[in-house]
Amino acid sequence: MKQTDLEKLLADMSLKEKVDQMLQLSGAFYLGDENSVLTGPANDMGIGKEDLEMAGSILGAAGADTMKKLQDDYMAKQPHHIPMLFMMDVIHGMKTIFPAPLAQGATFDPELSGECASAAAKEASAAGLHVTFSPMVDLVRDARWGRVVESTGEDPYLNSRFSEAIVKGFQGDDLKTPGKVASCIKHFAGYGGAVAGRDYNTVELSEHTFREFYLPAYKAGIDAGAAMVMTSFNTINGVPASTNKWLMRDILRGEMGFDGVLISDFAAILETVAHRSSKDAADAAKKALEAGVDIDMMTSVYAANLCRLVEEGEVDEHLIDECCLRILELKNKLGLFENPYKDADAEKEKAYNLCPEHRALAKKAAEESFVLLKNDGVLPLDTAKKIAFIGPYTNNHEIKSSWSFTGDSKDCVTIQEAAEKVFDASRTTYAEGCPVIGNDVELIGFTETTPKKYSEEELAAMEQSALQAAKEADLVVMPMGEHYLQSGEATSRAMIDVPEIQMELFHKVLAVNPNVVVVLFNGRPLDLREISAKAKAILEVWFPGTEGGSAVVDVLTGKKNPSGHLPMSFPYCVGQAPVSYNEYSTGRPNLPGMKERFRSKYLDIPNAPLYPFGYGLSYTTFAVSDVVLDQNEMDKNGRTAAKVTVKNTGDAAGCEVVQLYIRDDYSDVVRPVKELKGFRKVELAPGEEQEVTFYITEEDLRYYRLDGTFGSEPGTFTVMIGNSSTTENSAVFTLK
């Protein structure tokens, strides 16, 4: 449909029809008996029959046949035959579940994540979906916040590269292309900066920090063509995001040039009343509309108030026209006016879901996401030894994270299922040992039942079996970690320990067999002090998805060499949170070897995290040569090449992530001690070496200056290249 046709359609629509295009309801409103819905949830929400029939989009309904029926029913009642948009959270997979986003960040391979997004789009579009609420590009520094699992980490550069790759993976070059869906980046903005890591909490950020650290990944997604943006629940410096005109109109639409559809998060507009920044629902509707929010998700704030506000002269109808037109434009870009079903096809849905190609990709992504945190020479495993797999994740299918409800945990391969195909049964034992969490821990999922409670007799039997297996083994592999319901939305944790019941088992196993390898399942950095001190090896595997167990076994046995590097610092303890490598310089830095009192430090713990950003070991070793610059001076229109030679100095083939950091040695505004500005993943055979070159331009040196503009200043800059954020391998150049 041409733009002029869309504008004519808009002109033919009544005010009520336009407002209802701005309403999104869940599938529950359409999949039940209409009378029951109207007298039940719709009545409770203040939604009338006309709203129900005219709502412009639907949340959480999928399946090709289901979608086609709902679309047919909807369009039969739609006076202008405008198709409905189908949206859902396809965060890291539809039916084939790829590693959680934080795990994908550990791959340092945005292109691989783009491939995963493309595969997810293929499955989702065949199921009738048009939009996915992904990627989440919020910067995360506080491990207490449960939603760190949905982010790719603490660094704005790394997040930006993943943001653009995932958007392109979902959308391709044209939304009409078969197998593609519209991408909605979220949550705009600063949601990851919630005070104390408590979900939905206040966000207070200086404009300097906000623009330098938090905004870049959103901008990268928008520049990549993201069709939609979702508002965040939080306030930004006192104003809720969903009614924040400065944030939505000035920054998002003005500075960033976003011209797509802006949707609220679930009930976020109405929640501004609870924030006490809106007097009532009508006031919230007025403010959100003036901020340019196009779709109200799952409340009647727009549907019940906007028409009246226009009639009373409180809001200008042209604001509603702007919102409605953007929604119509998105439907047109998806090709829905020509084909309202787009790619919905039950046969293709069946063929794509969990197909061998997607499973292979899920396994590859999982393998590349694993981070070897420690290895005292016990990995890869010697399969000739007696090995006991002991722990609650030994044969646990719940390894896909809480934000993957479109997938089925039964489709996930467990460690035991994979190991039984590789290890000699006569030399291998398996024991659960204990549940993931104790009976005293209460967890509530989205739709899941609360975890099973165990009797004292059951717990004792599980433990006894595990300890007997540990005594008889040469080495124990302990798959352990967080419960999947302990990470994700509304899962803030004040203490980021491995559950107590598992730590008790860990110590009891150590008492009978000191040769313990920990395989860690989790959706956030955890306090690993005890495990790090006592385990012989630690393999971080996050929530690895459908092929998690197969990937773990391949890495444990050395079939695949781990190559992941941390996208988020693991704090020494929770008292360090929030912590990140790119902190600002202070006036009293606590430099190595200093024993002075009046320094920026803790009395009881070190300043440094236990495991820093960018850290990751391998079954081989790598040497990085001194940094060589092709010139020591650079003008603003030039570039400097920074080179190192990376050599595999070990006995196994492997991949290393070579990381480029830059420090501004002097500026009018205090700058970070270092900032990631590039990375390269290189694969090397034993003894092989490769030159890696990074090209540095003036753009890499820009920051948010005192005058409110982005730019650089002349002066010296230190270039550091190594395999983690702790590298000091450096050279200096001058920007003229």
Spell out what each predicted region is.
Residues 705-707:
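Flexible, membrane-facing loop/turn or short amphipathic-helix motifs
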